[in-house]
Amino acid sequence: MNLQIKHAIFVLGIFLQVQGIKDTSIKIFSSEIKNIDKTPRIETIESTSTVHKVSTMKRIFDLPKLRTKRSALFPAANICPQESLRQILASLQEYYRLRVCQEVVWEAYRIFLDRIPDTEEYQDWVSLCQKETFCLFDIGKNFSNSQEHLDLLQQRIKQRSFPGRKDETASMETLEAPTEAPVVPTDVSRMSLGPFPLPSDDTDLKEILSVTLKDIQKPTTESKTEPIHVSEFSSEEKVEFSISLPNHRFKAELTNSGSPYYQELVGQSQLQLQKIFKKLPGFGEIRVLGFRPKKEEDGSSSTEIQLMAIFKRDHAEAKSPDSHLLSLDSNKIESERIHHGVIEDKQPETYLTATDLKKLIIQLLDGDLSLVEGKIPFGDEVTGTLFRPVTEPDLPKPLADVTEDATLSPELPFVEPRLEAVDREGSELPGMSSKDSSWSPPVSASISRSENLPSFTPSIFSLDAQSPPPLMTTGPTALIPKPTLPTIDYSTIRQLPLESSHWPASSSDRELITSSHDTIRDLDGMDVSDTPALSEISELSGYDSASGQFLEMTTPIPTVRFITTSSETIATKGQELVVFFSLRVANMPFSYDLFNKSSLEYQALEQRFTDLLVPYLRSNLTGFKQLEILSFRNGSVIVNSKVRFAKAVPYNLTQAVRGVLEDLRSTAAQGLNLEIESYSLDIEPADQADPCKLLDCGKFAQCVKNEWTEEAECRCRQGHESHGTLDYQTLNLCPPGKTCVAGREQATPCRPPDHSTNQAQEPGVKKLRQQNKVVKKRNSKLSAIGFEEFEDQDWEGN
């Protein structure tokens, strides 16, 4: 009996084991069939899967271990009890990013390259995706523009376009016979298009013209192709060329793309060539591919710059064969059709044909004197005559009703300056008499706002021959001439005014009216005529119409402007780059002592942030020069700072500073226990920022911008005046860190808030007195220097 029972159990076990193996084989086979159906295009030879024999009883016992219970809240993630909610959310987001990137990269290889990726390249792409180096759709564009994908498409097009034709075999044999690569002609006019078929009207030319230049000479007689819509191939044209610089010797630093000399030369070359190529329609950008040494005919060594000019094409022009067969007949220019890179969609423009574009590029490169001589002037300034005497025909015609008491328009719009030949012979200043040295202004007329005139406030000059120092006086606005200036449109500027301090005056007694007696002594001998109306005076910088005083005895200077691109930032007029930024520290309490720059708490906090920011900015930003903490504001603690850089840096300044501060924010939060809020980062370049935005003057004062120093200062409001010194009593300026105290009908000194009124004010008073002396001395020097330069250049012939 026992023997029969054992025999029955043995037979049952054998039966269950065989049945389990059969079920496993069926499941594996069915899964393989499904995978093959899902990927019909991938043709790979895979080895037969090895089926491991697993006991049915073992699988039954292992089933509970595999099917672990998931969390009801997060069914796809394992939650550890010791993790916080923030850590759990971060883990889920990281896992989600990983899975999405894996799917994106896998599908990109399947769709565009029709193959399974290698482990190393797959991990590289997944890593780039996780770091957000590429957007998800940018990954697809990168794969679609790869050479492997283009070659695969060309192969598929050939296979599907010529099915079962006998002449296809002969054509393929002809193509495979030669061992040398075909020679591509360098001139469009000599390029043979005879063997190339002319398709019918309903055939998309992009399938035929998307092949490379070496495929053009392949003989074929087919005239029909199956339409394959590939719209991104023809949206841009890239032309490679090189420029030889005979007077620039090649340096070893140019072989390293990370060296400062390499980056500086790249930025300067791009800036100069963009000015030349922007004349061509459709020009997008220019790239520097590298530098290489070149030996000249005389045996000397020179530098050759390899560049690439990119032109944008619209959809209509993409269907023109000439746009794909661009080749320039020049010893310095080579054209190549390249299908790489991410293509940006631009608005359609009017483009020239390939032949016209070739001629224009050659004319630009050969016609530019700097390129012919092998020298590229990497500067924004040109030297030349500063002033051009204006003759009567150059003046605008007066209106029908002209009166002598008419006034000039205070402001005129600005136009882009351009260079024009200067003729100094036989011209005089309007109103100048040859018998005496006095200059009476011509009859002024009302001039309406015009788009062809620069934004200069008109000036009236008068000269007194009897005064020992023949100083020239100016009207409301003036500019100081410099040795080198940007190009100026001489056809529209009647006179380039002299930069000096502007002062109100009376036309009757010609006396200088000002509230500062010290300034009168420094500028003795000046007189001003033709007083503008009070409404016009109020529009000038620093004039308070209520008190009738000039708050700032300065003249507005041209606004600082930065040239900013994706790869560099350059300051114009030889100035340095300046960036203002502010950040908020949430976990730091604010104290009113931080309003006073002389307090110990302010100085300690200033030193703390200086020690934190300066090393980080210096090590991460090329060209960093100085950091200045401007002030602290209430709102936890808001730190307002100013950073100075070199005149040019090889990166986008605003984006680079933001990136460094974002990195610093996370570092400070971890190591220094400073919670710097990300959304509070406010970064502005100096050409766009308002200096008064970062200065807190209190409710009894207002911020005033000093046009000479480009700095912001606090000025007491009317009725809340300062008595610290004679100078600041006149200008009503509070020292930085001081606030004005209320006092009606009597002046009260500018002093800190009530809790710190007993602090000594001597350091601040001395500093302010010294600043005033510097400003007055500068005004006097600039007036004398400006007059001497004007007299030497324009009155020499008279």
Curated annotation (Swiss-Prot):
GO terms for cellular component: extracellular region; interphotoreceptor matrix; photoreceptor inner segment; photoreceptor outer segment. Pfam families: SEA (PF01390). Residues 235-357, 575-688 form the SEA domain. Residues 1-20 form the signal peptide. Glycans are attached at N142, T174, T186, T457, T473, T474, T477, T559, N596, N620, N634, N652. SUPFAM superfamilies: SEA domain. Residues 424-446, 745-773 are annotated as: Disordered. Highly glycosylated (N- and O-linked carbohydrates and sialic acid). A motif (Heparin- and hyaluronan-binding) lies at residues 625-633. GO terms for biological process: extracellular matrix organization; visual perception. Abundantly expressed in the retina (at protein level). Residues 430-446 have a biased composition (Low complexity). It is found in: Cell projection, Cilium, Photoreceptor outer segment; Secreted, Extracellular space, Extracellular matrix, Interphotoreceptor matrix; Photoreceptor inner segment. The keyword Repeat applies. One of its GO terms (molecular function) is heparin binding. InterPro entries: IMPG, SEA_dom, SEA_dom_sf. Chondroitin sulfate-, heparin- and hyaluronan-binding protein. May serve to form a basic macromolecular scaffold comprising the insoluble interphotoreceptor matrix. PANTHER family: INTERPHOTORECEPTOR MATRIX PROTEOGLYCAN, INTERPHOTORECEPTOR MATRIX PROTEOGLYCAN 1. This is Interphotoreceptor matrix proteoglycan 1. It comes from Mus musculus. The gene is Impg1.
